[in-house]
Amino acid sequence: MLDKIVIANRGEIALRILRACKELGIKTVAVHSSADRDLKHVLLADETVCIGPAPSVKSYLNIPAIISAAEITGAVAIHPGYGFLSENANFAEQVERSGFIFIGPKAETIRLMGDKVSAIAAMKKAGVPCVPGSDGPLGDDMDKNRAIAKRIGYPVIIKASGGGGGRGMRVVRGDAELAQSISMTRAEAKAAFSNDMVYMEKYLENPRHVEIQVLADGQGNSIYLAERDCSMQRRHQKVVEEAPAPGITPELRRYIGERCAKACVDIGYRGAGTFEFLFENGEFYFIEMNTRIQVEHPVTEMITGVDLIKEQLRIAAGQPLSIKQEEVHVRGHAVECRINAEDPNTFLPSPGKITRFHAPGGFGVRWESHIYAGYTVPPYYDSMIGKLICYGENRDVAIARMKNALQELIIDGIKTNVDLQIRIMNDENFQHGGTNIHYLEKKLGLQEK
């Protein structure tokens, strides 16, 4: 097993990684910015290293500082968590070149899956169903581009090859808008991602967001751990996640899961990963692969009993998967609500000091967070301050538990989205299951009905 690792992240995921390390007897090094000295995992880690001032670019995105911290503490590996440098192929490469283990896939795999055009090509080759599209980057010949759009059928969506998180994409509903949309998306992509390559896909009007969790050891073994539904979104950011996805039959799960597991072997994948799909009219359409642990990984852990962070650590230590596909069983249902420090009306971040805090509890209730009474939420980072996960023997029980847990949760001193989450849990359409990715924005009046 690994002797000592650097946790190159902050907040709830850093604490989650630290807990897994402690259970496995792995020593921990918490690297942190000057604003994060009082973070829970920093207070609990075996060693701490301040890697720079508050802004992310000078601390959590500072590659030389993170690698130096590993060197001076004698760590053997670096866990990137999610966000920050977790899907940065150059970081993964520099970590390995410096003689450390990157807890995640190889740099070339991150690069392959990070570029949407090469990722789609690799998935098609592996037999994973993809959205009908241009099968490569768009050129300057508008006659050819119009022909592609006609073949796919309007509406289409123009996407930046290096994009993500809802940025660098435009919906086009007819020939008249096509040329301008391509040039505008190119300009946007160049500015945001330093890559003006764009491609075209069929635009699905009312899809759900369903994703498959995978684990692969890089030694020819891979498994899928059922699916999650993350359709409750606002501005392409997930708000509520659940597992398994409502209405997905065991046959459908096996069909898509086996293809994802095979794709992992085909591309030489190592670690935890997630295949994201749009799901409409009983069909899956691959959109991207996240080559890291996801925010919503706990709902999968709750229904399968598999500790995904521990598996990441074991795989990084060179061990084969500790679980076989036939040992993965889906039991019950889990729902996760992301708790954000934000104004519930404007959705603007709400940093500040937490004056009073009480975590919910009870059977089947899990609270993943770094906050405590007296903790000051800094203004420099993502607004998510916790995740509330509730498990039940079925979906109705999980939702009922979540309603109670949200009512129990007390966070005073800052504004949060707890009331929004209570509204979602009480929403009839959510309770019925299977709402699409536009549902929440329409409910909130952020999108035309």
Swiss-Prot record:
GO terms assigned for molecular function: acetyl-CoA carboxylase activity; ATP binding; biotin carboxylase activity; metal ion binding
Cofactor binding note from Swiss-Prot or TrEMBL: Binds 2 magnesium or manganese ions per subunit.
Domain Biotin carboxylation: from-to ranges: 1-445
Active-site residues per Swiss-Prot or TrEMBL entry: R292
Entry EC no(s): 6.3.4.14
UniProt pathway annotation: Lipid metabolism; malonyl-CoA biosynthesis; malonyl-CoA from acetyl-CoA: step 1/1
Binding site for Mn(2+) 2: E288, N290
Binding site for ATP: K116, K159, G165, G166, E201, K202, Y203, L204, H209, H236, E276, E288
Binding residues for biotin: R338
Signal sequence, renumbered to the chain: none
Alphabetical UniProt keywords: ATP-binding, Biotin, Fatty acid biosynthesis, Fatty acid metabolism, Ligase, Lipid biosynthesis, Lipid metabolism, Magnesium, Manganese, Metal-binding, Nucleotide-binding
Chain sites annotated for binding Mn(2+) 1: E276, E288
Protein name (database record): Biotin carboxylase
Organism: Escherichia coli O157:H7
GN (gene name): accC
